[in-house]
Amino acid sequence: MIYLIRWLIGKLRRRTTSPAVALSGRDEPAVHARGERFVTPRKVAASDAVKGDGEVGGAPALSALGLGKRFGDRVAFDDVSFEIGHGEVFGFLGPNGAGKTTTVRTLGTLIAPTSGSATVAGIALTPDNGVEIRRRISIMPESPGLYLRLSVTENLACFADLYEAPNPGDRVDRALRAVNLADRASDACGSLSKGLRQRVALARALLNDPQVLFLDEPTSGLDPVAARDVHELIDALRRSGVTIFLTTHRLEEAERLCDRVAILNTTLRTIGRPDDLRDQLFAKTLTVRTLIPLSEPGRVFADLPAVDGWRQDGARDYVLAVSDSTLAAPAVTRALVQAGADVLSIGESHHSLEDVYLELINEDEEARRR
């Protein structure tokens, strides 16, 4: 077995100069392929990009300005700009083919952008800086890409050696403890469930103590229990100060984990906190249900504080557009009581992040059909 490990390490060393590239499945960094070149970053004012929280000394952990990638005539993504603060969990959402994974590969120095500029872990994204950037980041791809006949420890040891970090054995032990896999260290990866393999892949991504961690669909194909385990690990990483760039199709996952989210559909459609995006896209509403229809709903709902309008939805349901539900709800309740209405329920309508996502993606589809 030890000879197999040595052979694998030697082969990996010949194939790549960086663990990040080794994880990509490519023989060489794309920065050297097909004549592609990075665009020299241009200086911009701090106000030109959308900022995140937790920035240290005004410098974001990760930023992009007008970043784009084309493959011939096909646009993978275009004109993407954002700033992500240190220790922020940033969700990157979008339909299949929107450019999410290509964005991760670009920011991770695995392929070169064709337009725009970026900084990763505080370093400008240029050909000369690729190696230094990869020392500060890790990428966990959607597919774990483990050596199934090797044990968990042997898999991690291969990559710890590639990082050429001091005390690789200690790093492997620490990574195993971080993902709660110390008791499975000697198990062959081929014997593990998909959820446990994802945890091994996450442990591998932590071997170099990354400042920025890219997680590409980390819970894809996992059952709810395994996905919850990954969520708890992400929460722990957030508390330790790691900046996390998370792509996912699970909108409830993004809503639970992310400080802010961006929705990409080739171009960036929106960016912000989930609550702020809901407020921007949807009016706040109160829904009232009565036992019998109101005889004069217009009089009942007239001139109430923070109530901007109303409509009847069926025989006994009334939907009120409100600017502030905490002010409107008591006023609406008093008005209904004074009118002698038998109220069955009154409550605020809540829109989910999925509602925001579908609204924006449907807008794009309608625009294409015009």
Task: Show the residue positions of the predicted features.
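Short, charged/small-residue-rich alpha-helical element at the C-terminal edge
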Residues: K11, A283-L360, R370
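Conserved ABC transporter NBD signature motif
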Residues: G116-L125, I133
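Conserved ABC ATPase "signature" region
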Residues: S138, A157, D161-R184
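Conserved catalytic motifs of ABC-family nucleotide-binding domains
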Residues: D209
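Catalytic Walker B motif of ABC-type/P-loop ATPase nucleotide-binding domains
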Residues: L213-D216
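ABC transporter nucleotide-binding domain
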Residues: H231-S323
